[in-house]
Structure formats: C-alpha cells, structure tokens
C-alpha cells in the first residue's frame, strides 16, 4: 500500500483499506502491524503556530520509514483532513531526517503534527515551533 493508506473496516478476519494495494499477489496468511500516529504537537486553542523546522533521529539499529503529517482539525477525520509533508522517508540506522527552515508550515488552532514510523519507538523528534502567532 502507498503511504497514507488507512484501515477503513475490520470484519472478522478481513481488513479493508481506503485504497487498493499496488501488490497484485494474495495477502492471505501475512502479518500486519497496526502502528498508529504519534501526535508530536498540537497548536493551542485560539492561536496559530508556525513549524519552523525539526530533526527526526533514528535510534534503532535498522533503517525505518518516516511519515510526517499535518492534521487539520477544522476539516476533521476525512480523506482531506490530513496532509503529508514528508511521506515514507527512509531514515538509515544512526541517521536523521531534517525539515529545513526554508519553508514554514502554519498550524491553526487545534491542528496537529503527527509522526508515523514503521517501527515502534524508533524515532526521536526535536521540533522548532513558533507559538502564539495571531
């Protein structure tokens, strides 16, 4: 499945996703890991914040894939409620991924920065955020 695919329904032993797989072979008898997002930051109520930059360090001995997403709280949980700002970025063991300060991301009241990783507890995040913007 491509990045951003979500489980739409679980019916007994069958799992349905919100889009088709790019894999043409059968997926029976395979192990599936359900790793959800970690909300790294939520913009405070009645104000805006600006994501200036961030460093996401791999603290494991294996390469991991990282996805960063902005959840727009004004839209809610829909297919348009989240926008990936980095999708399936490979982060080698002992390395990091950096969001540079060349582009800023405005977070409105209640918006969230979410981090997805394909391994549990594999990423340490350090964020630079300007808060209290009106």
Spans of model-derived segments:
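Intrinsically disordered, low-complexity Pro/Gly/Ser/Thr-rich segments with frequent PxxP/GP/PP motifs
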Residues: 73-112
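Short, charged beta-turn/beta-strand-edge "cap" motif at the junction between a beta-strand
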Residues: 1-3, 103-106, 119-121
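General beta-strand recognition
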Residues: 14-16, 65, 124
């Amino acid at each position: 499945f491509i990045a951003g695919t979500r489980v739409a329904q679980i019916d007994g032993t069958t799992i349905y996703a919100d889009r088709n797989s790019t894999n043409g072979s059968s997926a029976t008898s395979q192990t599936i890991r359900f790793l959800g997002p970690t909300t790294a930051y939520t913009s405070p109520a009645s104000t805006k914040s600006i994501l200036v930059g961030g460093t996401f360090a791999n603290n494991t001995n294996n390469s991991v894939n990282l996805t960063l997403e902005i959840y727009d709280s004004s839209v809610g949980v829909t297919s348009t409620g989240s926008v990936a700002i980095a999708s399936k970025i490979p982060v080698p063991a002992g390395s990091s991924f950096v969001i540079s300060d060349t582009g800023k991301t405005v977070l409105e009241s209640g918006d969230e920065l979410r981090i997805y990783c394909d391994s549990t507890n594999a990423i340490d995040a350090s964020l630079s955020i300007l808060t209290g913007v009106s």
